[in-house]
Amino acid sequence: MARSLKKGPFVDEYIIKKVIAAKKAKDNKPIKTWSRRSTITPEMIGLTFNVHNGKSFIPVYVTEHHIGYKLGEFAPTRTFKGHRGSVQKKIGK
């Protein structure tokens, strides 16, 4: 279910403050965040966020195509190692 339009997108307040400060100072340093739930807004275009995936921080450079998505969508939390059977089939043939 989508968020109500009258409420607007959710963004943690400290991220908004850091984005405004980075734009004002024209700083290219990545913004470190644990807030995977925050929605990407147009003010964030051109900034880099280090998004925590539970183990490490993944750099996410925000472009215009990312608007409306959550920061966490670009920092995967799980690594897929492949299915066990597919490797054995290749070796057996």
Swiss-Prot record:
Pfam families cross-referenced by the UniProt entry: Ribosomal_S19
UniProt keyword list: Ribonucleoprotein, Ribosomal protein, RNA-binding, rRNA-binding
GO molecular function: rRNA binding; structural constituent of ribosome
Gene Ontology process terms (BP): ribosomal small subunit assembly; translation
InterPro entries: Ribosomal_uS19, Ribosomal_uS19_bac-type, Ribosomal_uS19_CS, Ribosomal_uS19_SF
PANTHER family in the cross-refs: RIBOSOMAL PROTEIN S19P FAMILY MEMBER (PTHR11880), SMALL RIBOSOMAL SUBUNIT PROTEIN US19M (PTHR11880:SF8)
Homology family: Belongs to the universal ribosomal protein uS19 family.
Upper classification of the organism: Bacteria, Pseudomonadati, Campylobacterota, Epsilonproteobacteria, Campylobacterales
Protein name: Small ribosomal subunit protein uS19
GO cellular component term, pick one: small ribosomal subunit
Domain of life: Bacteria
Functional description taken from the UniProt entry: Protein S19 forms a complex with S13 that binds strongly to the 16S ribosomal RNA.
